[in-house]
Amino acid sequence: MLPMGGRAPEFTLPDQDEQNVSLSTLLRHGSLILYFYPADFTAGCTREACSIRDLTAEIQQAGLDVAGVSPQTPASHRAFRDKHKLQFTLLSDVDKFVIRMYDVQGPLGFGVRRATYLIDQARYIRSAVLADFRISQHEAFIRKAVALSAGGARRAPTT
């Protein structure tokens, strides 16, 4: 994992709608919860995504945004989003370029580790958690990020 206090590397990846999305774009309204997960439609990843979905209102109220990254295609992400009514961006990193940049590749480069970063608008990593099999730790991490951000700057209104 990347160290807390370090700068989050800039990237651009296609989202579930095949639109290129950069880290800078994701940060335009406030801090970002960037989470990495192994695969769409697996039991653990579905549980994690749905727990984030269920926190969407609180996340947005705190001025945060969310994006998930995994090596599946935009089409897979679109189906996953639609089936589970996810309201956040899913980014496709088929070549695992960003996964490697953020140092969350699995052992010997296989797979993806379950990791979540809180990145501020200046691209500094404010906090992070790595918990491959303890999905509840990611939900607790997000709840803590929401609580910490709730008193801070609110999301800029969209037009």
Give the predicted meaning of each segment:
Residues 1-159:
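Chalcogenol-based redox active-site neighborhoods
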